[in-house]
């Protein structure tokens, strides 16, 4: 039940916080010649974080000449893979919820539904682990590439001590951090559901039968051996008890000598 409720929600939070992100930073370059300064340089970037395609112009503080720069890095592969896994996990969890509720008989027919569900759950657990780990590394690269201090190092005007370069504000990465958290939460949720799905498959029931058959055989052989021992003991005890009493011959034997003193006379 937890899987039905939380899997679609966690998947939505994962791809929404990552795929819907857009942010930026603002820098300022104050040249010695104030007419050449630019105190508001806005650099915007968004999903899928192809930062090498994000270009911007900054003053060189050498006349009216301007320098065209671009951010460094490309984290699009890890970000797109993460969002793709989240979208497909959301769609599958919705479809599985509909099947669980409305097509329970079809789901358990020939044990095909539980087997498919088990395989898909294992696959998505692996994909969530790989996707979340890759996106965590990609997010780390995005943070470094969009750090205002790193961007200022790209500007030739900022290498001259007479010019003043500073960051006005940095990009907000809280939603991207949340996406990584939800990615690993999805992995924990799907991996924890593997055992519950496995219990519904025929593999689990066949394994239990395989373990119970030798135990039943062992217990039946033990009971049979105990019965034979009891039978043997009761029969031997009966023979011993029968041999304790006197025989009919012993009771029937008459004395051969005289029975009275008068007869002797």
Swiss-Prot record:
Signal peptide: none annotated. The modification Phosphoserine is found at residue 212. It holds the Pfam family MARVEL. Residues 224-243 have a biased composition (Low complexity). Residues 210-242 are annotated as: 5 X approximate repeats. Sequence repeats lie at residues 210-214, 222-226, 227-231, 232-236, 238-242. The chain crosses the membrane at residues 5-25, 82-102, 115-135, 178-198. Residues 221-265 are annotated as: Disordered. It is found in: Cytoplasmic vesicle, Secretory vesicle, Synaptic vesicle membrane; Synapse, Synaptosome. Residues 1-202 form the MARVEL domain. Residues 244-265 have a biased composition (Polar residues). The keyword Hydrolase does not apply. Its main location: membrane. Intrinsic membrane protein of small synaptic vesicles. Probable vesicular channel protein. Belongs to the synaptophysin/synaptobrevin family. This is Synaptoporin. It comes from Homo sapiens (Human).
């Amino acid at each position: 039940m937890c899987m039905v409720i939380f899997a679609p929600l966690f998947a939505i939070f994962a791809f929404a916080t990552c795929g819907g992100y857009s942010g930026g930073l603002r820098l300022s370059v104050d040249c010695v010649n104030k007419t050449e300064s630019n105190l508001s340089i806005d650099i915007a970037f968004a999903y899928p974080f192809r930062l090498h395609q994000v270009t911007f112009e900054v003053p060189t503080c050498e006349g009216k000449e301007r320098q065209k720069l671009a951010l460094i890095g490309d984290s699009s592969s890890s970000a797109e893979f993460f969002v793709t896994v989240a979208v497909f996990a959301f769609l599958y969890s919705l479809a599985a919820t509909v099947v669980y509720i409305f097509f329970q008989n079809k789901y358990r027919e020939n044990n095909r539904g539980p087997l498919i569900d088990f395989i898909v759950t294992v696959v998505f657990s692996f994909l969530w682990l790989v996707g979340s780990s890759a996106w965590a590394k990609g997010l780390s690269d995005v943070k470094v590439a969009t750090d205002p201090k790193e961007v200022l190092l790209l500007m030739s005007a900022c290498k001259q001590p007479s010019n003043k370069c500073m960051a006005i504000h940095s990009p907000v990465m809280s939603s991207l951090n949340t996406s990584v958290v939800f990615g690993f939460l999805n992995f924990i949720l799907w991996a924890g559901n593997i055992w519950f799905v496995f219990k519904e498959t025929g593999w689990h029931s066949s394994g239990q039968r395989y373990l119970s058959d030798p135990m039943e055989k062992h217990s039946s052989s033990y009971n049979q051996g105990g019965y034979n021992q009891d039978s043997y003991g009761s029969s031997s005890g009966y023979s011993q008890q029968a041999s304790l009493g006197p025989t009919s011959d012993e009771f029937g034997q008459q004395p051969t000598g005289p029975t009275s003193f008068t007869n002797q006379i």
